[in-house]
Amino acid sequence: MNKYKSPLTWSLSLGVLLLLAVAAYNIDHQVSAEALNDKATPPTRPDFSLQDLEGEVRHINEWDGQYIVLNFWATWCPPCRKEIPEFIALQKKYDPAGLQFIGVAIDDTEAVSQFAMEMGINYPNLIAESEGIELAKLYGNTYGALPFSVIINREGKIIGRQVGLLSKEKILRLTQLQDD
């Protein structure tokens, strides 16, 4: 009997290992998504107040009656920076329909202010610094990952959460706003 395996046997073995690795990756990510959508997250948004870039204390209930996209982000987070131009465009387009983006920056005022000016951010940004991670956990981000977004309906109920980049399609689907 040949103690060396044929190239076909090696290829099949490698293929099976790759399939197992892909399956394990998908199961892990599916569990992560399910963990974020468990019953531990309150259906109604938690209340909070934070200072904006001008130092004014803003309360989340100021935006009651609107669809809210609450986005936890930081200037040092590349995926956070990537999604902001889309948020700027959506805020401009859907503001008349009652869609309100609110940034919750896990950063200091100076860095956020400079970045907001450079990018032309047209929606409120609240400064949470490191305390923002705990606030994000109250909204269901058990991993402390950024970016993290929460979509809240007009009645103040959490209707969606997203760890990582939030797509325009998901926002429009959950808010039932129409894309022209």
Enumerate the language-model features and the residues they cover.
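N-terminal targeting signals for export/organelle localization
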Residues: 1-47, 180
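A short beta-strand-turn-helix
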Residues: 47-68, 94
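Conserved hydrophobic/aromatic "anchor" residues
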Residues: 48, 72-73, 115, 123
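Conserved redox-active cysteine motifs that mediate thiol-disulfide chemistry
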Residues: 64, 72-89
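Short pre-active-site segment immediately N-terminal to redox-active cysteine/selenocysteine motifs
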Residues: 66-68, 72-76, 108, 145
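Structural microenvironment flanking redox-active thiols in thiol-disulfide oxidoreductases
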Residues: 81-120, 130-137
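Thiol/disulfide oxidoreductase modules built on the thioredoxin-like
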Residues: 117-122, 128-176
